[in-house]
């Protein structure tokens, strides 16, 4: 891999650091971060979710905590609002809530595009790439080669870059790629690296996407890799789909650190639970060489027989941060779906991340399952915002709009619903004054299902594949359903029964659809602890372009 694009990024970074607030600095910043004034579709620009100021983004990459900051790199097109010219964008946060956009970290060039990968802090300097007193950040990413690269066009291999200034600038390793297949492959990608403490080595998961194989490797120095094993399914039920972005994560079962299970996250496209792309997972054991799942759905099973991190349509390319200070892994995903991502009606940007989420493993119905909740930092921040407490409401065969004080387009709603004798009960968010527009969260007592229904949520005809309803089985707990709902200008995220179920959907409502209502159908339901917290007043958490 040639380093011309990296050196260009270095020159831009040095210019940004050196320049004062003048024309040269403004132009350099705009070229790398896109800080032109907002235009296009600001009514759908996220306030709570990271999105670049302009242009296309997809997979989160290089998720790492270093020197007091969370780093979010991501697949980025620096020159357009469609997929292409794959490079690594870059943003940072100190709290997982407020994000700052930085110049492009690694840029596509004439012979190579920079596909997905991961970053670790090489605190022991096992790679030998650090400088005195400064351990390096090491990125492993997929090089996709073009004509003139010395590889067949389209070949994918794993390459390395490193930083000795906490991620501000990146230097390509002189002998890239560091890992290839023999024969070379056009589907070998997405390295995720972590430290495997029991074996004192680095562990990498990658995929051969079209073969539905996760390949595991080990290394002592992040440069030289040896094969460990393959993980696949004996009867892959989704022929034609791709496996992408694997991540192997250890978690204590029910909080017992003496009982560690391993979770293999595999993002699949298409064939997800909600249609199109999604993130499934397997729980099992890892012995230092081989991952063995506890259960695999029988041959011929449909998606409902598999486990999913999220049952909505817009949760893909999920991965976890490396080196986080807390005890629970923190994951984040791309908030879109390959079924319609290229047609999402936003401009001058297209693509956003989900809320960061904490992962835990709990025994549910006799099996270990992931529990997914908003990151504690988000909830702590939201807890400090002004809230309206509606108290307890009883609704019988009716829809009741909440008080005017609950109106807003960026908010967190918490409530416990007791459906009682109602056939269906729930909430409507981003509801219009005439009631014709709104996103419905519906519990069906007979079917024991929770539905996120965006069929009347606003603009929905931009793509025929923009699915309307997303349904998940969910029994009540002691006759109740606990919900945490996070509403942004262009999305709704639902966390039910303490994270047992999550649903994430994009929505595109008119700006004046700012009301909240509760409803019960064919009977009585009660809504207790109903609290609406406004999260927009006082400034956005969304990205601002910044010099390093």
Where are these regions (language model features)?
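Beta-rich accessory regions
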Residues: 255-257, 285-305, 309-548
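N-terminal signal peptide c-region/cleavage motif recognized by signal peptidases
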Residues: 25-29
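Bacterial N-terminal signal peptides
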Residues: 13-24
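Catalytic nucleophile-His microenvironment captured as a short glycine-rich beta-strand/loop
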Residues: 249
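N-terminal secretory signal peptides that target proteins for export/translocation
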Residues: 1-10
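Beta-rich carbohydrate-recognition and catalytic domains
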Residues: 31-190, 195-243, 252-310, 326, ...
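Short beta-strand/loop turn elements enriched in aromatics
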Residues: 5, 14, 32-33, 447-456
